[in-house]
Amino acid sequence: MKRLITFSIILFSTFCAYAQDVEKTITLNEVTVKAAKVVNKADGMIIYPTDAQKQASNNCYSILEKLTLANLRIDNISHSITAIDNRGGVQIRINGIVVGKSEMLALNPKDIAKIDFINNPGVRYGDGIAYVINIVTRRNGSGYTVGMDLTSALTTLQGDDMVYGKWNKGKSELSFSYDVSGYKTKGEKSKQSADYTLKDGRIYTIERNDVESLRKSISHDAKLTYNWADSTATVFQASLSGAFNNAPDNYTVKDIVDGTRQYKATSIAKDKSYSPVLDIYFFRQLTPRQSITANAVGTYISTQTSSFYDEGAPYKYDVDGKTASLLTEVIYENRLKPFTFSTGLNNSYKYIKNNYLGDASSLTKTNNNRLYAFAEIKGMLQPFSYALGMGASFIHYTQNGHRYNFWTFHPKASLTYQINNSMQLSYTYQMQDKVSRIAMTSDAMVRTNSMEWTVGNPDLKPSHDMEHRLRVSYNTSRLQTFVEGYYKQCLKPNMAHYERTDDNQFIYTQINQKEIDVLDVYAYASYWLLPEKLQIAANGGIYRCFNFGYDYTHCYTSWFYASSITAYLGNFTLQGYVDNGNRFLEGESKGYNGAYSVLKASYTWHDLQFSLSWANPFKSNYKSYENELLNRNIHKHTVGYSKANGNLISLNISWRLSRGCKHKSAEKRINLRDTDNGIIK
């Protein structure tokens, strides 16, 4: 009760500072919007990139990076998008389809009409998704498009290169992409000090400091897609993709100080996998208001891993993993006059067979079947807009004699009050049951070092989460800003649990424990100092978490910020970005993911764009992470450094050529994907 009162006081004290007249917001389909760059809605905002932003960008990562979306770190160097607030994952879509790196690099930013940034996803998006970015294009692809995107680090061995092409004739379109990326670095090192409380009460200390390391990996991804579109009434799309990843002979040499002994220990890891994926999609406009969409994805993953570590005594195991899954989904939508109604059914079946050989001998066979149904309505009663949704899942799970049936539920309600043309207040409440990731439900047991083991727990049950979100936003033609309060209560979550054996070995697993609570208050602002020429943006706030285990209570407060400045100078673009990283406490682990800063300059010449970036400047030994374990019997402090990611200078060259007639591409409303191989590491 005290936490709820504190939460309310913080929210209302934060929200007491908005009142002034504003210009009228104008939003028109397929029309350049001059009066407002951002339009707020119940589940997020619609962003209309300016012509300057589109002209200065060479792919989707580039244009999203310039928008400085709150709580997201968008890196056009590594082609990655991550949430820095630990609320969940980020889902990227183009015209409704969940896409990957190849589609993000191939899309021409000049074809973007708007970007739908959903920071409050509805029930149809499923579990674990905190943010959805849907990039909506004008769907006017040319008769053919060919291009390439080449990125290479100049200060270390790291690269990411892709070529792509698209050809269309009549109602048909064929597209292909191939991407190869890799790295080889020797500057990844960590320092760790661990204190173990033994059965007799003595403190036993071990120091583990890296003195030499090698990290290398190469990945190949190829995708072939055929699309047939009959105007907008019927769409059929089939794609076949394949991924191959190989990380051979990575090793680390550690200097071990173990009591009175000092010696060298070596860890060696190998990882190889390949995965073909077949994706079939169908859309039919039944009537002007009704539509039905179906999607089916079949995935096969083959994984071979090997791990060796000789701290204390040699320990080696291999894993031969096979995973097959079939994911299907059907969605019906009806745009009624008072509201829009949508309902859908999603079924996923997954079979995993992981054979642990060597010192970690175990054979795990898992069958996981999940049936998810949802219904949602969205409507408007001026000056209010609302969304009501309900999802329910039935999960059937078997593994090596363990058998469980779960029902999980996901209700959600949102209400938005439009105070005036530029200011709105919104509130969202949702409940959600979450299932632990598959690897931790395995019954395999793997040694981490001479004192520690990791053990799966097939008896894990879903946790029960409740979220409250209150936001006030204010927009004008040059200023976009909001303040938000967020409170999350997790009941019976999967939390860390450590056990000490009679022979002084320490076992890490997860069990359902009491509760985790999170309070987050933050603000965001973006302002055009010079319209279409100079833009600044910043966001920041305070994060407070409470972890209540059966035998521990840990609380933690942290603050965060991110800011950027971008100048559009004709064919030149200059950009700077900085954030202070991500600090969190979950269970008994306090963590920090490193701060990030970058300076960029780009130049556009005809169909070519050249970009030069300098990431983490003046940091020759970049601090990439820090972890502290707070268990009563184990205290560990680990700091990781990366020379490769400090003072990282990268060059990007992109080229795109489009010619020919127009073709309406598929607006894929749903998409399914599976990448989890269920292996404990």
What role is predicted for each listed range?
Residues 20-53, 77-78:
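Short, acidic, small-residue-rich periplasmic hinge/interaction motif at the N-terminus
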Residues 30, 60-63, 80-82, 102, ...:
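N-terminal periplasmic accessory domains that precede
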Residues 51-53, 142-164, 639:
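Short strand-turn segments of transmembrane beta-barrel domains in outer membranes
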Residues 73-120:
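Periplasmic plug
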Residues 150-154, 169, 180-184, 242-246, ...:
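Transmembrane beta-strands of outer-membrane beta-barrel pores
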Residues 219-247, 268-402, 406-411, 418, ...:
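Face-selective signature of the C-terminal outer-membrane beta-barrel domain
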Residues 404, 423, 433-482, 489-491, ...:
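Outer-membrane beta-barrel signature, preferentially recognizing the C-terminal barrel domain
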Residues 605-681:
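C-terminal beta-signal and adjacent terminal beta-strands/loops
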